[in-house]
Amino acid sequence: DALIELEYRGGTEETKGDFGKSINITFNSVNKEQGSERIYVLRNPSRSIPLWLEEIGDIEIKFTFSDRDELKLKFEVANVRENSLRLKASKAFEDVLNKIAWNKCTKASITLKNQIDLMGKLRSAFNGLGLEDGFNLKENLDDNLKFIFGPPETGKTTTLAKKIIGMMNEYSTCRILVLAPTNTACDELAKKIKECSKDDCAWLYRFVSTADESLEDIVVDRESMVYEDEQCCVISTMARLPFDGFNGEGGYNKLLDIVWDMILCDEASMIPLAEMALAIYNFVNTPILIAGDPLQIKPILHEEEWKDENIYTMVNLDRVENPVTEPIQFAIENLSMQYRSLPAIGELFSQYAYDGKLRHYRSAMENHMKFGKLNLKPINFIPFKVERYDSVFGIKKLDGSNVHIYSVLFTLEIFKYIVREYAKNHEEEYSIGIVCPYSPQAQLIESLIMQTPNIPVNVKITVGTVHRFQGGQCNFMFVVLNPPAGMKVAADRIFLNNKNILNVAISRAQDFLCILLPHCDTDGYENLYEINKIGRIAMKDYANVAQYTCDQI
C-alpha cells in the first residue's frame, strides 16, 4: 500500500502534476497504416504519451494542413507506442478520411482534458480489499495460481486460445475474464481464439473497444448484459479492472465484482505487481492462470523500490529448468518448441535466456535468400567505431538519452541496400525491424527511413525500442546497440546490460539477425558483459555467424 501511494504521488518529472490539468501533445507526422482505411499513425510526439490514453475513447485530434483549414476528427481507440500513437477512426469517418490529402498534413495535435487517474483508482480498489496492515502479499499466495511459461514464439497465445475454447466446449456454464496489459495484447488473443475456434465464438467479447477492425463484431459496451450469459469470455486491459464494468439494465457490476469461473492474465511480465496483486486477492477463490515469459519486458514504473517487480519476481520464477517458486511450488506448464526463428537464431536466445531447453520447429535449410554481394548468415555481427569526442562517432545526448550518429547513418544505408536487393528478385511481403535500446536513436532512424523514397509497398518496416517489439517478429532484424555514456562507470544500470531487453531484441528475428554493436576497442567495452555473453554463445555455432566491419560493408 505504501508503494502504491508513492507511485500515486510520484511519476517522472515530465508527468508530475499532470493530473487535473490539460495535456497538449503535437505530432509532426501523420500516415495511414498500410492495408487499412481507418487506422492512422501519428509520429514524433512533442512529449511522452501517457499510457492511460489506451483506456479512453472518442479521442479528438486536430489536424493542420498546408492547403486547407484545420480539421478535427474523433478516433475510437488508441495504441500507445514510445514514439507514435496508433489510432482507429470510427467507421462513420471512413469516407471523410479517404478524401483527405494526408501528404499536405503538417501537424496533428491532441489536448487531453478528461484524464483517467489509473493509479488513484488502483489505490482505492486495493484499499477496498480490506487487507490487514502488514498483510504479506507474497506469503499468502495460494495454489489457485497456475503458470504458463511461454518463451518467444512457443505458441503461448495459441495455447491460451485452445484452453479457453476447451473450457467452453466442456462446460455449459463458463465465464472467463481475460486481462492483458495493452490493447494490442488483448486483440492478439481475441484474434487467435477466433482463428482456432471451429464455431462462431458467440461467447467471445472484447470489452469496450478494439484497435483491430476485424474484431469490431465482438466489441461490447458497458450497457451489455453478456456477463449474465451462461458462457462468456470477456477480454479487457488490466488497467480497467479497478474501476470499469457493466452498467446496463442489470445495474452497476464492476469487473471486480462479477463471479467468474476463471481469470486469465496474459503477457504477465508487463503487468505491474500492484495490478496483479489486486486481481489475485480480489479473486481468491477463483482459478487464476498467469501466462507470459519472465524474461521479457518488465513493467514501466517510477518508484525505484519496485521498478522491476512483477508476479515473476514475487514468486521467484526466473528460469525454465527446475524452477523453485515461492512461497509454494506452483504448477507450471513450460512451452519449449519455438516456431519463429531459424535454428541458429533460436538456439542463440535459447542458450542465452532459457537454459538451452528450447527445441526448434524450422529447418536450417529453409533460408536461401541472398542480398547482392552481402553474404549474410542467420546471425551477423557488425561492430562500429566509437570515439569519445568525435561529432559523428562520439556518444551524444538527445532529450536526455543516448544517440550515436554514425550507427544511425550506417543503419539507414545498410537498410536501403537490403531493401533494394530484395526488391530486385522478390514480390512477396517481407518485414524488416530495427530495434534500439534508446528511444531517440530509434526516432532518428525512423525519421530518416520515412524520408527515403521508393521503398517497395511489399516491405513492411518497424522501428522502435524493445517495447515496440514485445510479441512481434520480422523476417530481418537489425539490433542497433548504440552505447550509453555511462558504460564505463555505471555498467549495472545501462540498458545494454539488461538481460530482458537484449533477450527481446535478439528473439524477434525469423531469418536474419544483424547486430550492430560498439567495436571491441571502445573504451569500456569490457563492461558490456551481456553483449559479450551473446557473442560467445553465437560463436559456438560459427558456421551460421558472419562478422563484418563497417568499412567492409
Labelled PLM ranges:
Residues 153:
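Walker A (P-loop) phosphate-binding loop of P-loop NTPases
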Residues 160-161:
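Post-Walker A alpha-helix
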Residues 156-157:
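Conserved lysine of the Walker
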Residues 18-143, 201, 207, 214-221, ...:
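Pre-ATPase regulatory/linker segments immediately N-terminal to the P-loop/RecA-like helicase/translocase core
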Residues 3-25:
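Short Lys/Arg-enriched alpha/beta "domain-start" segment
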Residues 165, 173-263, 300-315, 366-367, ...:
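Conserved P-loop NTPase motor core of helicases/translocases
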Residues 146-149, 177:
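Short hydrophobic/aromatic beta-strand immediately N-terminal to the Walker A/P-loop
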Residues 171, 181-184, 239-241, 258-553:
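Conserved helicase motor core of SF1/SF2 NTP-dependent helicases
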